Amino acid sequence: MLEEIVQLFFAETPELLARIQTAIAHGDGRALERAAHSLKGTVMSFGAQMAGATALRLEVIGRSSDLTQAALVGAELEREVAHLGHALAVFKGEPVA
């Protein structure tokens, strides 16, 4: 079961991050809110508190429609998700760089 959830993380997360970046680039607060909310649920399923909190910040930014901090928080979220991805790759026994 856990392995399936890990596979789902690797399958869905790149698309969610791309949707977040597109929403930020287009100034689409509603799309940012939805994508950040989805990613928050994904990362929190692994107990990734920092990534979850950062996704929540983006969700709130999207809801407010004041996207002035969105790019900065989006970059922070990408770093947090990369850390989680690294940890999950190690868990799966995959070689990591």
Where are these regions (language model features)?
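Hydrophobic, amphipathic alpha-helical faces that serve as interaction scaffolds
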Residues: T54-R63
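Long, amphipathic alpha-helical coiled-coil segments characteristic
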Residues: M1-S38, T42-S45, S64, T68-V96
